[in-house]
Design a protein with these regions (language model features):
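Interdomain hinge/linker segments and adjacent boundary elements that couple functional modules
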Residues: 1-87, 155-158, 165-192
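C-terminal regulatory/effector modules of DNA-binding transcriptional regulators
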Residues: 73, 80, 92-192
């Protein structure tokens, strides 16, 4: 699959996960992206041809099958988005509106929680980088930490534990689910 080498191992864990906890500070998570948004993001890759970008978009969309599978059941998904993610114009306004509207729809699905970490949270640990925690079974066991060079996958218990604490701290700063949905609906309207 056409994923960065640093992320490729995590796609296996993602497919086996019973729960995913995801914090993003700059972009909509790949599992939640629309095709148009993904295309806009992936088009920023230097030296990529249109065919390569379309292959990457198709791979990203295929990953989303994990959210609609029945056997085994889809993982529970807990997503924390920095408010700036909703406002960052990475694509044309209609693409941004469709993307934020898509997030609203996803947030209404069983097993999906999307919460917004508002600007008013000020400085917080999430500003240092995005991360995903995959729980397989009852134990949170694998973390992918993004950085400027791609990222890394780790099963180190201390690192996973720190990521869980960071996630819990960020979640305590996040708006409640209903308020987050209201914010996303308002932002979607602003993109029109």
């Amino acid at each position: 699959m056409p994923f960065p080498a640093s992320f490729r191992p995590f796609t296996v864990y993602e497919a086996e996960a019973t729960a995913l906890r995801w914090y993003e500070h700059s972009l909509v998570p790949g599992l939640l992206q629309t095709g148009g948004y993904a295309r806009a993001v992936l088009s920023t890759r230097p030296n990529s041809t249109e065919d390569e970008i379309e292959e990457l978009v198709a791979a990203r969309m295929a990953r989303q099958e994990v959210l609609v599978r029945e056997d085994p059941p889809s993982p529970l998904l807990y997503v924390l988005l920095d408010e700036g993610v909703l406002h960052r114009p990475v694509a044309m306004p209609e693409v941004m509106r469709d993307q934020v509207t898509h997030l609203v729809g996803l947030s209404q699905r069983h097993g999906v929680t999307i919460q917004v970490v508002p600007y008013t949270a000020g400085g917080h640990s999430g500003l240092l980088g995005a991360f995903i925690i995959a729980e397989i079974g009852d134990v949170p066991g694998i973390v992918f930490i993004e950085d400027a060079c791609g990222g890394r996958v780790s099963e180190d218990a201390a690192l996973v534990s720190q990521a869980m604490r960071n996630f819990d701290d960020l979640r305590s700063e996040a708006l409640q689910r209903g308020v987050s949905r209201d914010v996303m609906e308002k932002v979607a309207e602003e993109w029109t």
